[in-house]
A protein has these predicted regions:
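Residues on the lipid-exposed face of transmembrane beta-strands in outer-membrane beta-barrel proteins
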Residues: 43, 57-63, 88-94, 122-130, ...
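Short glycine/proline- and aromatic-enriched beta-strand/turn motifs that initiate or cap beta-hairpins
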Residues: 22-79, 237-239
Length: 239
C-alpha cells in the first residue's frame, strides 16, 4: 500500500515539475528581452572515404528584431573538401499553449570547388520546442549545377528530432538527435545520427558541440561510405 502511495506521489510531483517547466520555459532560440544580437563560430573536423580527413569553420550571426521575428546569416568553409557555403534564414516565433513554435524560410548555397558543382537549396520548416525535446518538419527544394547541366530533385521532406537529458533552462545539457539536415546541408532520407552538448557560462557566453555520423549517399560528403564529424564552438550574445 505504501508503495502505491509513493508511486502516486512521485507521479504527481513529476507532473507538477513538468507543468512548472512548461510555464517558465522561454524557448531555446528566442529573444531574451536584452540581447538582440548573437554570433557564433565553430571548428569542424571529420573524415570520409573520398576526401579523407577534413577541417573547416562555421560562422553565424543572428539578429532578434523582437520576441517574434529574427534573421540568421551564416557561412561555411571546409578546406579539404574545398566546400564553401552561405545561407540566410528568416524565422517567426510564436507560442500555442505550452509549445514554442518556430516557422522559418531559408535559402542556402554551397559550392563544391573540387567537383565543380553548385548546390541551391530552399527550405520551409516549422519546429516544435519544449523543455526537454524539439521536433522539426518541413520541405526542401534542392537544385544542382554540375558541369553545365542543371538538375532539381523532387520536393524533399525535412524532419528531425532532438531530446535532452536536462531541461533547457539548465546551464549545461547533453542530448541525442537524428535528422536529415544540418547547418549547411539538407538530405533526402540519409539520416544524421548524433549527440550534442552545451555549457552556458552566463547569459552572454555559451559553449556547444556535436558529434555526428552520416550514412552513404550524402551529397554534402560526396562519399560512398559513412562520415563522422565533430563540431565545437562558442556563442556570444550582446545588446
Amino acid at each position: 500500500m505504501r508503495l502505491i502511495q509513493r508511486s502516486v506521489i512521485s507521479l504527481l510531483l513529476a507532473f507538477t515539475a513538468s507543468t512548472a517547466l512548461a510555464q517558465y520555459y522561454s524557448g531555446d532560440h528566442t529573444y531574451d528581452g536584452e540581447h538582440q544580437n548573437e554570433a557564433s563560430v565553430s571548428l569542424i573536423t571529420g573524415k570520409n572515404i573520398i576526401t579523407g580527413p577534413c577541417i573547416g569553420n562555421n560562422w553565424h550571426y543572428k539578429h532578434y528584431f523582437n520576441d517574434h521575428w529574427s534573421i540568421d546569416v551564416g557561412a561555411n568553409t571546409q578546406y579539404t573538401k574545398k566546400l564553401y557555403g552561405f545561407k540566410a534564414k528568416g524565422e517567426y516565433h510564436f507560442i500555442i499553449q505550452a509549445f514554442h513554435l518556430f516557422a522559418s524560410g531559408e535559402y542556402m548555397f554551397n559550392h563544391y570547388h573540387r567537383f565543380n558543382t553548385n548546390e541551391n537549396v530552399g527550405n520551409l520548416s516549422i519546429r516544435f520546442e519544449r523543455g526537454y525535446w524539439d521536433l522539426a518538419l518541413g520541405a526542401s527544394m534542392i537544385g544542382y549545377n554540375l558541369m553545365g547541366d542543371h538538375y532539381t530533385e523532387p520536393v524533399t521532406l525535412t524532419f528531425g528530432a532532438h531530446a535532452t537529458l536536462r531541461p533547457r533552462t539548465n546551464n549545461w545539457n547533453v542530448g541525442l538527435l537524428f535528422r536529415n539536415y544540418d547547418d549547411f546541408y539538407y538530405e533526402n532520407w540519409n539520416i544524421n545520427w548524433g549527440m550534442d552538448f552545451y555549457y552556458r557560462f552566463n547569459p552572454q557566453w555559451k559553449m556547444f558541440g556535436e558529434f555526428n555520423i552520416r550514412p552513404s549517399g550524402s551529397m554534402s560528403q560526396l562519399a560512398s561510405k559513412y562520415e563522422t564529424t565533430g563540431k565545437v564552438g562558442l556563442i556570444y550574445r550582446w545588446k
